Design a protein with these regions (language model features):
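Short S/T/G/P-rich N-terminal loop/turn motif that feeds into the first structured element of a domain
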Residues: 1-51, 55-69, 76-93
Length: 93
């Protein structure tokens, strides 16, 4: 069953977000990683949020092991554990 994951960083700016994306390539981390169906970054600068849709919790957790060192290096802090919800339905165009 698919999952919606919502991250609420405490200090996410466009510059930090863009740097984290650049560092994925530098670290050899594929984007999108296996199991990630959708990634959306939204909000106002300094208060950006990220939501994702994942195929499974195992795939999310595997990516998290690669992601957390990148976020730490860039200075992105999370306000706690992400919110995780089971998907009831997805409609795509």
């Amino acid at each position: 069953m698919s999952l919606v994951v919502r991250f609420s960083p405490t200090n996410l700016t466009a510059e930090k977000y863009d740097e984290s994306i650049r560092r994925h390539a530098e670290a050899g981390v594929a984007l999108p990683p296996d199991g990630m169906d959708l990634h959306v970054c939204f909000g106002s600068n300094g208060n950006l949020r990220v939501s994702e849709i994942w195929d499974s919790r195992d795939q999310l957790d595997a990516y998290g092991q690669q992601l957390m060192p990148i976020l730490a290096d860039v200075g992105i802090e999370l306000s706690g554990e992400p919110e995780i919800f089971e998907v009831h339905n997805i409609i795509k165009r």
